Amino acid sequence: LLFFIPFIYFVFKKILNISLIIKLIGISLLILLQGFIGWFMVRSGLTENLSVSHYRLSLHLLIAFIIFSSLIWLSFNHYFKTNKKFFSIKSSYVFLKVLISLIFLQLIIGAFVSGLDAGKIYQTWPLMDGAFFPSDNFLNNFFNFNDPSFVQFAHRNIAYIIFFLSVYLGFFIYKNKI
């Protein structure tokens, strides 16, 4: 209701242009989808095992992030001019897409960490119980997103990659005076 009532009001008052109306209709459809996904997620926990599926949890979080990001993107495009110098450099645009994709992946794996309670198994940092690779049967379960050990390992290391790429992006922007 917080979205739909003002949206309908602005449409009837002809405050929004057609391009923005179409984009906001797309976002409203995502909001409806989010409700269905929320029920789909909760339903997975209404069994003998009272925990929700980490896959469904991550899907619910991802759709929420897409909705939020879309609204932020629309508002920034409305209030600020695009940095044409940054986006005219093809490599910087590709780099930014990679960084944003990694952030989305990190969100998904973070939901896996939450859904699997993977954060409870290795509570030491920066190493995992004194080793870079977890000591349990980790290598046999590589890319097994049902294995809490692998999920925590992936979540930690993607965070390192995002950090270093973000620092590099900051230096790139500073160096090129963007």
Predicted regions and their residues:
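Polytopic transmembrane helical bundles with strong interfacial aromatic enrichment
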Residues: 1-178
